[in-house]
Amino acid sequence: QAVNAVLYGKYTMEGDQFEKIEVDFGRSTKNNITQGSGKEWSKQDRDTFDPTHDLDLYCDQASGLVNIAIMDGTVWRLLNGFKLFREKLDTRRGSNSQLETAVKDLGAVVSFKGYYGDLAIVVAKTSYIAEDGIEKRYLPEGTLVLGNTAADGIRCYGAIQDAQALSEGVVASSRYPKHWLTVGDPAREFTMTQSAPLMVLPDPDEFVVVQVK
């Protein structure tokens, strides 16, 4: 949910007991960009092209300040291939505790490359196992995500439709624990915790997602 909300401003929610539904946060179309003909980074001169103008233009589409760029390896290789980008990339700046905390346990799949002005450059290779059993990357190939490290989602909870919870006066709760006994030989005691979280992105325009070609 969270990754798709950032990438597309929406996601599909589905389960065994309800129909598939699309949760759309209403991201502006200008915040999902695909590099057009003649603008592709792969077709630019590596010695003379400066990607600064493009990056500034992309960042301007966000509703707030952008201070981090997260990309896959394909985008990083393109960017780092530009001479003018390498000359401006600061790899010696001092510590940033907030950023270090965010990536400290992800050293094998997340790499902090440095700062491009005030923009932290991070390469992510995180993956997950899809329903078909195939490992897939969270970031599709050629994806650049621009955002702010302070951006945060909200975990919302729907109503737990349990008559016992209602009879106990549970009106609003993130989780509802319950236990019950069954009569028999042997008798059994069961425990269960019910929860219905839904990830919400309050401002989907905080992020700008670029498909780099």
Where on the chain are the PLM-derived regions?
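Short, glycine/acidic-rich hinge or "gate" loops at secondary-structure transitions
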Residues: N4-I21
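Extended, solvent-exposed, turn-rich assembly/linker loops in the middle of proteins
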Residues: K20-L106
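Sequence/fold signature of self-assembling virion shell proteins
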Residues: T34-R46, R86-K213
